[in-house]
Amino acid sequence: MSKDQKSLILMLSNSQHSINRKFANELKHSLSCELIELKDYQVDFYSVDLEATNFPDKIKTLVRKIKEHSNLIFVTPEHNGFIPAFAKNIIDWMTRDEQYGRNQFLKGLNGVICCVTPATAGGGKTVLELLDKFLSFSGLNVKGTVLVNGYHENFDFKPFIEQVKKLI
């Protein structure tokens, strides 16, 4: 499969029983694509001092893996209106990778941002809007967002998977 056809799902939850992980796994099987768990790339919290002395190899590896794809699907829970702190930290580190230019590690890539939440209030919408701006700043061409709200047991993800397919 050429880069032009490759999609990658980035799971931004570190919760073992994440409803977003259920959605990401269904997406993975439906799209026949790779899924990367950001929790497998956890590193110390970013600081300028740490960057100057010890840029994490894990982050360089992750950025290289991302750059092998043309379409990214971010699947995230909502934590107080934004993504989980550990995921924000990993993205912060990736923006500092000099190989692709500061804040440009997503340049030339297309993306879809998804959030699954049991709530019906505005937290999910807020995280999608903020992550859209945050990732666009790093060069991502955000094709759209998919909000799955009102999640409950035995939920049918199929209509939302179809939305993602139309966007990538």
Swiss-Prot record:
Gene3D superfamilies in the cross-refs: 3.40.50.360
Keyword ATP-binding appears in the UniProt entry: yes
UniProt-recorded Gene Ontology molecular function terms: ATP binding; FMN binding; oxidoreductase activity
Superkingdom of this protein's organism: Bacteria
PANTHER family found in the cross-reference section: CHROMATE REDUCTASE (PTHR30543), NAD(P)H-DEPENDENT FMN REDUCTASE LOT6 (PTHR30543:SF21)
Name of the protein this chain belongs to: Uncharacterized protein MG342
GO cellular component: cytosol
Keywords: ATP-binding, Nucleotide-binding
Disulfide feature: none
Record-listed ATP binding positions: A119, T120, A121, G122, G123, G124, K125, T126
